[in-house]
């Protein structure tokens, strides 16, 4: 879920610049893949599509919904296998930075 956890607890070898939540919501599918690269997992579930991206620090789940003729981000979650708070904007920056360095 959306977390505003203390950014001091987030660490990544490619931390990148945090990406504001407002820009993740409303991002079209083309821009999503330009920013984060190829998803490591996709799933269609009724009216939504899940695209999962991964960095060394987190998984970023973007849920896209059909708007007009295309898909657009409506919900985003950051997940961490370790039990700690995870700020979504920092996770998004990490995933984007890792894509650029690949």
Feature annotation, model-predicted:
Residues 1-102:
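Residues within mature, well-folded domains
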């Amino acid at each position: 879920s959306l977390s505003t956890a203390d950014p001091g607890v987030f660490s990544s070898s490619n931390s990148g610049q945090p990406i504001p939540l407002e820009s993740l919501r409303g991002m079209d599918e083309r821009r999503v893949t330009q920013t984060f690269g190829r998803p490591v997992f996709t799933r269609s579930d009724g009216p939504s599509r899940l695209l999962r991206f991964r960095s060394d620090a987190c998984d970023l789940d973007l849920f896209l919904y059909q708007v007009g003729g295309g898909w657009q981000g409506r919900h985003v979650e950051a997940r961490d296998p370790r039990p700690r708070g995870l700020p979504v904007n920092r996770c998004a920056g990490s995933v984007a930075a890792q894509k650029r360095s690949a």
